[in-house]
């Protein structure tokens, strides 16, 4: 009994050792397989089958189970070992970088992209459209200016050619004529040009005369306005006395001949004395002047020259005062 128990213990120990060896070999082989798969891709199925057949001729189901266990345990262990070695080798800097990259990717996935790019693109597009519109406006303005300049140049050329054409036509029309007829035609053209110039001068003179007449009429109206203002002032004054109305028509008719009589006084030695016509309906034929009568006193100088100096100064001062009053009141100076 003691021997059998010792034998069984030894057999169990040997079996355990074998199993442990197999597991270690299978783990190393699985590690090599995973490394080769990661490095060079998958192996063909024929190689893996031949390798498993050559190892140990056992039952198919047992081999499957062993493979599954060994592959799962070895792959898990190898992954943990590799991850630990990588993390140890890289250190904290890699972890920080990886955490930053992960946070960035999460933010980029969760949050939408900022609109700054779109706004900048919109602004750039707006700027492009604005610059294009400005360029178009400038081109249009330049085209218009060029067209206007071309039109002005064409008009100037036409006028210049017309002037040259007139001279050329005159010369061409006179070339086939004899010299005597050419001279006559030229004289006729000169006379026509002079007549046109005379007409232009006459038109200018007429315009000037019309302007003078208008000025005189305006002055006459100014005199009438001044008289009216004076009359209104006299009426508004305290010394005004009401009077009965009298028509001025008869007064004007009777005053006109008296004015004519007073206009003719001594203006010189050769003054004319005309008898005024009677105011009645019938005019005597004897009263009509038939000849010029001279008032000649055989005097060499005017009697005003023989007045004393004091009297002449007084008359001159009175004249100046009257002129000043008329100028201030606005009435025309006589």
Swiss-Prot record:
InterPro entries: SRRP53 (IPR034604)
Chief location category: nucleus
BP GO annotations: alternative mRNA splicing, via spliceosome; mRNA splicing, via spliceosome; nucleocytoplasmic transport; response to antibiotic; RNA splicing
Region feature Disordered, mapped onto this chain: 1-173, 201-222, 241-290
Compositionally biased tracts (Basic residues): 14-24, 78-118
Coiled coil residues, start to end: 180-234
Record PTM text: Phosphorylated.
Basic and acidic residues compositional bias, start-end: 1-13, 44-62, 132-166, 201-218, 247-262
Superkingdom of origin organism: Eukaryota
This protein's UniProt keywords: Coiled coil, Cytoplasm, mRNA processing, mRNA splicing, Nucleus, Phosphoprotein
Compartments, record wording: Nucleus speckle; Nucleus; Cytoplasm
GO CC terms of this entry: cytoplasm; nuclear speck; nucleus
UniProt xrefs under PANTHER family: SERINE/ARGININE-RELATED PROTEIN 53, SERINE_ARGININE-RELATED PROTEIN 53
Subunit details: Interacts (via Arg/Ser-rich domain) with LUC7L3, RBM39 and RSF1.
Summary of the function given for this chain in its UniProt record: Plays a role in pre-mRNA splicing. Involved in both constitutive and alternative pre-mRNA splicing. May have a role in the recognition of the 3' splice site during the second step of splicing.
Protein name: Serine/Arginine-related protein 53
Species in which this protein is naturally found: Rattus norvegicus
């Amino acid at each position: 009994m003691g021997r059998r128990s010792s034998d069984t213990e030894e057999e169990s120990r040997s079996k355990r050792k074998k199993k442990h060896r197999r597991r270690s070999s299978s783990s190393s082989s699985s590690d090599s397989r995973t490394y080769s798969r990661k490095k060079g891709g998958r192996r063909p199925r024929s190689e893996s089958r031949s390798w498993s057949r050559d190892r140990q001729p056992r039952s198919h189901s047992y081999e499957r189970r062993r493979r599954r266990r060994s592959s799962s345990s070895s792959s898990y262990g190898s992954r943990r070992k590799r991850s630990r070695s990588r993390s140890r080798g890289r250190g904290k800097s890699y972890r920080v970088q990886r955490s930053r990259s992960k946070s960035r990717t999460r933010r980029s996935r969760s949050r939408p992209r900022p609109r700054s790019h779109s706004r900048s693109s919109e602004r750039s597009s707006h700027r492009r459209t604005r610059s294009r519109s400005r360029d178009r406006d400038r081109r249009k303005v330049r085209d218009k200016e060029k067209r206007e300049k071309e039109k002005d140049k064409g008009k100037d050329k036409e006028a210049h050619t017309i002037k040259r054409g007139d001279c050329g036509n005159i010369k061409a029309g006179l070339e086939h004529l004899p010299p005597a007829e050419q001279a006559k035609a030229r004289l006729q053209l000169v006379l026509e040009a002079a007549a046109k110039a005379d007409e232009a001068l006459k038109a200018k003179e007429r315009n000037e005369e019309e302007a003078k007449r208008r000025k005189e009429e305006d002055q006459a109206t100014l005199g009438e306005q001044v008289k009216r203002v004076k009359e209104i002032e006299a009426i508004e004054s305290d010394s005004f006395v009401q009077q009965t109305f009298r028509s001025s028509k008869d007064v004007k008719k009777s005053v006109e001949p008296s004015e004519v009589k007073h206009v003719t006084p001594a203006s010189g030695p050769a003054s004319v004395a005309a008898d005024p016509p009677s105011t009645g309906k019938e005019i005597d034929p004897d009263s009509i002047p038939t000849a010029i009568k001279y008032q000649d006193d055989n005097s060499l100088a005017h009697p005003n020259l023989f007045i004393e100096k004091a009297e002449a100064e007084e008359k001159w001062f009175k004249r100046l005062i009257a002129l000043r009053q008329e100028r201030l009141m606005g009435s025309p100076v006589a």
